[in-house]
Amino acid sequence: MKISFDVDGVLDTEQGMALARRKIANGDRVYIITARNEERMSEEVYAIARELGIPRLRVYFTNGEDKWRTIQRLGIEMHYDNNEEQYNKIKENTDSDAELVEYD
């Protein structure tokens, strides 16, 4: 399964990292899709990707744009995000499933 995770509020938490590790161990193809700006905010994102073993080719920055277009283009089947607006847009505009997470 093709699964994607947001960074802020998801992969930058212990719970989000643990879920991503479980999905990877399960054989899922995991991507990172973040609204962060690649030029200014990429180092932390790439560090998380390295820690999880996610290749840089599966890290996508939308640079403040909605994530649903990237999710649709990549054929992502499940996306985890903490932003309700992004969650709703994914559900409204794609065939992908999404889960709204609230991690500490």
Predicted regions located by residue number:
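Alpha-helical substrate-recognition element adjacent to the catalytic core
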Residues: M1-E65
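Short, structured coil segments at secondary-structure junctions
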Residues: N26, L52-P55, L74-G75, N93-S96
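Acidic, Mg2+-coordinating phosphoryl-transfer loop and its flanking beta/alpha structural elements
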Residues: I76-D104
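Hydrophobic/aromatic side chains embedded in well-ordered alpha-helices
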Residues: K2, G75-I76
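Helix-boundary and membrane-interface capping/anchor signal
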Residues: I71
